[in-house]
Swiss-Prot record:
The keyword Amino-acid biosynthesis does not apply. InterPro entries: APS_kinase, P-loop_NTPase. NCBIfam families: apsK, PRK03846.1. Keywords: ATP-binding, Kinase, Nucleotide-binding, Phosphoprotein, Transferase. It catalyses: adenosine 5'-phosphosulfate + ATP = 3'-phosphoadenylyl sulfate + ADP + H(+). Belongs to the APS kinase family. Gene3D superfamilies: P-loop containing nucleotide triphosphate hydrolases (3.40.50.300). Pfam families: APS_kinase (PF01583). This is Adenylyl-sulfate kinase. It comes from Shewanella halifaxensis (strain HAW-EB4). It is an enzyme of class 2 (transferase). Pathway: Sulfur metabolism; hydrogen sulfide biosynthesis; sulfite from sulfate: step 2/3. GO terms for biological process: hydrogen sulfide biosynthetic process; sulfate assimilation. It comes from the Bacteria.
């Protein structure tokens, strides 16, 4: 490693952000399977994209088709999965993007390791706090049924614990209210912390 050095390029993160007219940031959606993480993150990205903002959504299932397809679901593999995602998200934030990620990420330690990669204010934890009863009733992939039947081991919420965030910047229960209202609340928050230009957003709505 002593022969590997970091190359400082002439175009930095702030220059890329200024070009795009936004504040680069990572919104980390965490919650149980079926809580609505991907749906909420996807709807928010659509609203931002349609308003002209530069975004990218990292989805827990999608990254396992390429970046993390060599990983299983052991504790070590799950840790490595999130480590890779965190590093990719860091590169995307450095590129000036508003990055959204939707991962169960069940432990506080995992989430804090990702947070530590970013400057203050660039990691926004969104706890999708939908109750497990609602998540299990939805069961869009049939995973809860398989977990209850013992077909899936170490399933978060059933046979493995989920550590509720203690200091999430935002908490959203998708069983309360409609998707449009929840996305609006997220947009209001992003405007309040000056990630996005509220006037630009208003023109697009």
């Amino acid at each position: 490693m002593s022969d590997i050095v970091w190359h400082q390029h002439s175009i930095d993160k702030q220059s890329r952000a200024d070009q795009k007219g936004q504040k680069p940031i990572l919104l980390w959606f965490t919650g149980l399977s079926g809580s609505g993480k991907s749906t909420l993150a996807g709807a928010l990205e659509r609203a931002l994209f349609d308003a002209g903002f530069h975004t990218y959504l990292l989805d827990g299932d999608n990254v396992r088709h390429g970046l993390c397809k060599d990983l299983g679901f052991s504790l070590d593999d799950r840790d490595e999965n999130l480590r890779r995602v965190g590093e990719v998200a860091k590169l995307m934030v450095d590129a000036g993007l508003v990055v959204l990620s939707a991962f169960i990420s069940p432990t506080r330690a995992e989430r804090e390791r990702v947070r530590a990669l970013f400057d203050d204010g660039q990691f926004i934890e969104v706890h999708v706090s939908t109750p497990i009863e609602v998540c299990e009733a939805r069961d869009p992939k049939g995973l809860y049924s398989k977990a209850r039947a013992g077909e899936i081991k170490n399933f978060t919420g059933i046979s493995a614990s989920y550590e509720v965030p203690t200091a999430a910047e935002l908490i959203i229960d998708t069983s309360k209210g409609d998707l449009a209202t929840q996305v609006s609340a997220l947009l209001d928050y992003l405007a309040a912390i000056q990630v996005i230009d509220s006037e630009k957003l208003k023109k697009a709505i």
